[in-house]
């Protein structure tokens, strides 16, 4: 089976900053890391992710971008459809639990630019259940995404590059890794 390169992205933040780490893997092997910072509860996550991917030496080799949700840095929403359009790399959001959209919408109402944030949530598309995880996709079908998710797993149900990105991001912010991706 051909080994694909995947980019997994996760964040960690405190009251001062939010770091976003990307981990590039091929098979079970870590090939490199990407890094950027975003505003907590801001609206710059999409632009920063696109820029991070575009400047990467791995860009042409990445088969798929994995995210653990459409939010980073609190409520800094990622427009996954735009990330796909501007990088030409499919995006798969992998979640352990289906989000409560009423609760999510209620929390977003407390932030500036509610209508823009709501639009980003809407264009992220339908949430699909695959086994014991939930996914959203940009640039590929749910069944294609399922194959890529399965190819990216080493242990558990979260793509390995997302898990590693989580560990690195939390170590940068907290001095050691914490929690689960």
UniProtKB/Swiss-Prot annotation:
Gene3D superfamilies in alphabetical order: archaeoglobus fulgidus dsm 4304 superfamily (3.30.2170.10)
Domain of life: Archaea
InterPro entries: Endo_dU (IPR002802)
Family: Belongs to the UPF0215 family.
PANTHER family reported for this sequence: UPF0215 PROTEIN MJ1150
Designated name of the protein: UPF0215 protein AF_1433
